[in-house]
């Protein structure tokens, strides 16, 4: 069975980007991006709906974490793509209990490489997510079960130059 999670993450990123540029609701912005394969796969749609709802319902909390860890940046100055990759990854860390933190962070880094707003986007995303993850873990705010159980810190997910 094929998994569509990376594709779903990319579609949600595109929807979040659309929201930054024009007035619309997130469901409309994301819905037209989905492929028939995703629409017909109940597991894919479950993940899509969970991630989309988590971002929508918790955006203020997610943005507070980002703002607290981007000391020298006003939220409005962070590249739209990078900011929305961070939002998506934090929603996964906090609200998708079956996804390991290492996977959420690595997926965010890979998507940052693909949609990079600058040549340092993936490093920026990695650094911010690592700092936030460590804080959330220390505070006991990461709740995982099943495949999502925490087995080690993803602090060393990426230490090499992007390809």
Curated annotation (Swiss-Prot):
Pfam family name, one: NusB
Keyword Transcription included in the entry's annotation: yes
GO terms under biological process: DNA-templated transcription termination; transcription antitermination
InterPro entries referenced in this protein's UniProt entry, alphabetically: NusB-like_sf, NusB_fam, NusB_RsmB_TIM44
Keywords: RNA-binding, Transcription, Transcription antitermination, Transcription regulation
UniProt cross-references to Gene3D superfamilies, sorted A to Z: NusB-like
GO molecular function: RNA binding
One of the record's GO cellular component terms: cytosol
Membership in a protein family: Belongs to the NusB family.
Primary role: Involved in transcription antitermination. Required for transcription of ribosomal RNA (rRNA) genes. Binds specifically to the boxA antiterminator sequence of the ribosomal RNA (rrn) operons.
UniProt xrefs under PANTHER family: ANTITERMINATION NUSB DOMAIN-CONTAINING PROTEIN, N UTILIZATION SUBSTANCE PROTEIN B-RELATED
Name of the protein described by the UniProt record: Transcription antitermination protein NusB
């Amino acid at each position: 069975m094929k998994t569509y999670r990376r594709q779903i993450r990319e579609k949600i990123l595109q929807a979040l980007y659309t929201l930054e540029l024009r007035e619309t609701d997130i469901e409309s912005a994301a819905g037209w991006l989905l492929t028939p394969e995703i629409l017909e796969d109940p597991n894919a749609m479950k993940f899509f709906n969970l991630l989309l709802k988590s971002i929508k319902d918790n955006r203020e909390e997610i943005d507070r974490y980002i703002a607290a860890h981007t000391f020298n940046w006003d939220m409005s100055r962070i590249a739209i793509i990078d900011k929305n990759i961070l939002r998506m990854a934090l929603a996964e860390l906090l609200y998708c209990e079956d996804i390991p933190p290492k996977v959420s962070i690595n997926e965010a880094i890979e998507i940052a490489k693909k949609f990079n707003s600058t040549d340092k986007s993936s490093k920026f995303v990695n650094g911010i997510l690592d700092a936030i993850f460590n804080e959330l873990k220390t505070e006991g705010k990461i709740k995982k079960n099943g495949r999502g159980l925490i087995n080690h810190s993803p602090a060393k997910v990426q230490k090499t130059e992007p390809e």
